[in-house]
């Protein structure tokens, strides 16, 4: 699931199409609800999704975790599926023109958060929980 406007950049468009991703028009509530429902059904049927709940990519973010958009977790809530936080370290360097040599990016899959753990939480609380776990992992490594 990606912002429609940003999904048409070089390489990104190809990846979104290859992975059969969804393009989200940020200010279109009706379309957002449709995508949440589609993603929920896809997930129930076994399809995996990668979400970047920060809602965008900050250039040269230096491994800072920005605020998460609570709506990013609505599909998981609706589908009653686990949320697997993933901490990315140094991924920003790939998109930063200051780094012209090979980049090593770390990908850390954290413990899943099962539906039973988050079922009584609001989506904003889930967003904070996931963000905190990712930030804790990044802080423990850097």
Regions found by a protein language model. Name each.
Residues 1-29:
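Catalytic core of membrane glycerolipid acyltransferases/transacylases, capturing the structured
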Residues 32:
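Glycine-rich anion/phosphate-binding loops
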Residues 35-142:
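Non-catalytic C-terminal accessory region of glycerolipid acyltransferases
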